[in-house]
């Protein structure tokens, strides 16, 4: 069987974001299956620790945005050397909002992207967003933060290595 670490393995995630006044502001986490609820997460042990450790910081920053109630989701893509987050927003950010997001991106060393509509509207928050890529079986794969990639890189690497082994003459 192919196995991976139990914790910190998840390299791709889509978190729901919702402003709930009765809960004191923004909640963030995975959507409950077949329900309109979000499981409010302050940490997520299956996510890469670089992201899990900053969920409350993200929440705090989002709570201070003028459009906090208009952010429905956060798409996360993680590689060995980069973390990219696509912030889906339904209303435009103010200049103050953009400054706050830039400060967080610099402090966390993350790349933020903004998405106001479909995939064709995704733009980097700043002009210096680094490309995402990972190496597998000697091939470097480049991708965008919203592209499909395997959630569990360790399992993916093991499966590819096993497939190559089985296909060898």
Model-derived features: where do they sit?
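Accessory RNA-recognition modules of RNA-modification enzymes
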Residues: 1-169
């Amino acid at each position: 069987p192919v196995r991976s670490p139990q914790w910190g393995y998840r390299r791709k995630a889509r978190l729901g974001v919702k402003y709930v006044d009765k809960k004191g502001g923004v909640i963030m986490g995975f959507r409950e299956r077949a329900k309109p609820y979000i499981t409010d997460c302050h940490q997520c042990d299956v996510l890469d620790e670089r992201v899990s450790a900053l969920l409350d910081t993200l929440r705090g920053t989002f709570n201070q945005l003028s459009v906090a109630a208009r952010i429905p989701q956060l798409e996360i893509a993680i590689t060995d050397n980069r973390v990219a987050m696509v912030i889906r927003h339904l209303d435009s950010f103010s200049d103050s909002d953009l400054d706050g997001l830039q400060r967080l991106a610099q402090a966390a060393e993350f790349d933020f992207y903004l998405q106001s509509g479909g995939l064709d509207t995704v733009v980097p928050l700043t002009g210096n967003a680094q490309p995402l890529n990972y190496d597998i079986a000697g091939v470097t794969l480049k991708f965008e933060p919203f592209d499909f990639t395997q959630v569990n890189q360790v399992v993916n690497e093991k499966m590819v290595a096993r497939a190559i082994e089985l296909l060898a003459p």
